[in-house]
């Protein structure tokens, strides 16, 4: 399952917008308020159509239930109108979201939700996606080994907290579909259900091999190794401590030392990423237990991540996208970020820039570039404080006007501020020395 296209009309800050997505990963960047999270919210709304209806028996539920709650009045774009000295903001209608999705069987499906006015909602072409869901349910209940796609959203409030149990235990009318419970919640991991599954698998594993349980633990280990590739780190093994109800990271070093850390002991950034990987992998195993040891490699789907760089050390920021893609090769990741470090490891064709309600591609290559050039050329951000930039420009002006004494004075100030080993300070010193010859 992959998202091909998203169309927005009068949704939040967007007048009209069409977005196409890469099969592997798409990274959205832009200033605060540019609409990065709004795009994820629009995708969340549309994907809930699939997730909500998959969890319910469509022979008993009303298929249009979610359509009545999809788009809210607060989602309408506001247009400012000047009336004398007063500025009036009026919601613009209709608010329309349309999504086009390709399924794993190459079937293409599109559907729309529309808020015609504050009191009127409508859905279009949802019959096709509902029929697909009903057929999926039928295949599962009759024993067909159909692959269910992972669909999940991890927002900025994502966390793994071993003491705060935010979600009650839940189940689906088809046990296999329990992998979708709260998957688009965005606020927290489904901790209770995940712990229950880990504990149950641990008990079964004492009697016989459980390939899908091994695959889930291996996925967490692989992702950790892909991000934290310290030379002296020999191996990483992931286990589950049933007594402490926590995932354990066991790290083995070349010098023979071993370090065992419960997941909740890790830093917020490490904990957030590894808990997210655990959540994705666990859901895959629930949705597709028949795939056994191949469940991580063979499960496709869509994962939304807001601010993927959140709390991460720059070294992890640089590797996180490639680590997730290698760990879950068939998953389409759609993420937002403020970090230029993330972008240094992402090809420009996978980056979308949001600005003033429009979307653009970077006009320069990004993969392998240094952080400063990404900041300056892609994110349109000064790499130095404005006062420092002005001082560097003043040095250039002094050299151009052959004011050597002034250039020396400015360079002395720059050395005091930046140090003598700063690249531009070194260059300025060379320039000054040449001017004195």
Give residue ranges: language-model regions:
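Extended hydrophobic secondary-structure segments that form protein cores and membrane-embedded regions
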Residues: 151-155, 238-239, 301-307
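Short coil/turn segments at secondary-structure boundaries
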Residues: 166-167, 234, 386-391
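Extended helical coiled-coil dimerization/tether regions that scaffold
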Residues: 100-102, 175-298, 407
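Solvent-exposed, amphipathic alpha-helical segments
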Residues: 46, 196-201, 283, 391-401
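Switch/communication elements of ASCE P-loop NTPase nucleotide-binding domains
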Residues: 1-58, 246-383
């Amino acid at each position: 399952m992959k998202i091909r296209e998203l169309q927005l009309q009068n949704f939040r800050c967007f007048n009209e917008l069409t977005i196409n997505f890469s099969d592997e990963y798409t990274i959205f960047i832009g200033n605060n308020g540019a609409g990065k999270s709004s795009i994820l919210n629009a995708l969340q709304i549309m994907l809930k159509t699939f997730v909500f209806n998959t969890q319910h028996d469509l022979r008993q539920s009303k298929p249009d239930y979610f359509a009545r709650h999809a788009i809210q009045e607060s989602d309408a774009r506001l247009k400012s109108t000047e009336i004398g000295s007063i500025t009036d903001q009026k919601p613009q209608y209709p608010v329309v979201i349309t999504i086009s999705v390709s399924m794993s069987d190459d079937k293409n499906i599109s559907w729309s939700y529309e808020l015609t006015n504050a009191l009127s909602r409508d859905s279009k072409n949802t019959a096709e996606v509902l029929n697909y869901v009903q057929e999926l349910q039928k295949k599962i209940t009759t024993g067909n080994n159909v692959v269910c796609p992972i669909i999940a959203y991890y927002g900025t409030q994502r966390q793994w907290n071993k003491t705060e149990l935010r979600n009650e235990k839940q189940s689906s009318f088809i046990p296999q579909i329990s992998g979708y419970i709260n998957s688009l919640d965005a606020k927290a991991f489904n901790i209770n259900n995940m712990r229950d599954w880990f504990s149950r698998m641990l008990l079964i594993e004492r009697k016989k091999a459980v390939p899908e349980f091994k695959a889930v633990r291996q996925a967490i280990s692989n992702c950790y190794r892909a991000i934290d590739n310290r030379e002296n780190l020999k191996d990483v093994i992931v286990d589950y401590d049933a007594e402490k109800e926590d995932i354990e990271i066991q790290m083995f070093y070349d010098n023979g030392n071993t370090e065992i850390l419960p997941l909740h002991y890790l830093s917020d950034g490490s904990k957030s990423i590894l808990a997210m990987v655990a959540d994705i992998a666990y859901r895959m195993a629930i949705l597709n237990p028949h795939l056994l040891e191949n469940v991580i490699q063979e499960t496709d789907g869509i994962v939304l991540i807001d601010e993927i760089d959140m709390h991460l050390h720059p070294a992890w920021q640089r590797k996180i996208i490639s680590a997730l893609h290698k760990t879950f090769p068939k998953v389409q990741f759609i993420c937002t970020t403020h970090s230029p470090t993330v972008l240094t490891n992402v090809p420009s064709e996978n980056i979308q820039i949001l600005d003033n309600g429009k979307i653009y591609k970077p006009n320069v290559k990004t993969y392998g570039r240094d952080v400063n050039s990404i900041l300056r050329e892609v994110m349109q951000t000064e790499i130095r404080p404005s006062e420092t930039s002005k001082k560097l420009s003043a040095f250039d002006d002094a050299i151009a006007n052959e004011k050597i004494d002034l250039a020396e004075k400015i360079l002395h100030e720059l050395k005091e501020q930046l140090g003598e080993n700063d690249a531009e300070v070194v260059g300025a010193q060379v320039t000054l020395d040449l001017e004195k010859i």
